[in-house]
């Protein structure tokens, strides 16, 4: 069962979203079906039935506590190695360790400033290892030491709290914060950003974001997923981001104890937060539903630099 009050509240919220966000759920399922068929073409005939069965089990949960158990059972039954989900688990682990880090690095490389880089929320370290191989001095941190063998040579410090950035002031030219902030609980978002600003002159932040329809859409204009997403009411866009995140982490990967902070924001909300703490927005790029991602969401990359007058603020 969910062990903390925060986790119980998060699962109740996700349960409500699943039960009442029918439009968002339909969008999420069609997004996943299209993506899984594209990434796992050998098994495309299994995909729709698997998603429908998974969804039926999740919707049968009567409350957040039951949804927590259902997510674990659905993962084991349909997505884990050794069972009916071997097709998914083998393909996904290859993607996560090989293709995904290369794509992620390509999406960030042009924005990295200087030579020292912090990968904040580094996980297994696949991306950090590539950053190191590209000639940067790459440092890592996360709430737990999840590093795989390719990243064990990189400096790592474990975070002592959800807002801790355990490195010295001004230590980095750039910090990469990839789809981390929406997993942070609301009271921690600004303290964490202030700590990141303390250690790095530039932050390269990628977030699952909604309310992007008034942004200039260059390369993304022909993404059918983004067109469909932008037609949804903003409240439904938010629900879809919640469901995509829950499905991609708890259901597909079995990460049922992940902190689902659900801090999804509009582009203009992120801009106001950055401005309020002395971070100047250098670039905002709507990447949208990147075709290379298995679990796609509407992603926006923000490049923000510290206003030098605010170092000690």
Placement of each model-derived feature along the sequence:
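N-terminal accessory regions of S-adenosyl-L-methionine
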Residues: 1-104, 113, 217-241, 252-257, ...
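Glycine-rich helix-loop-beta junction characteristic of Rossmann-like nucleotide cofactor-binding loops
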Residues: 106-113, 165-166
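Conserved class I S-adenosyl-L-methionine
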Residues: 114-123
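A conserved beta-strand element that flanks and buttresses the S-adenosyl-L-methionine
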Residues: 176
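Short catalytic micro-motifs in class I SAM-dependent methyltransferases
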Residues: 179-183
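A short, conserved alpha-helix within the catalytic core of class I
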Residues: 184-195
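C-terminal alpha-helical "lid/dimerization" subdomain adjacent to the S-adenosyl-L-methionine
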Residues: 208-277, 282-292
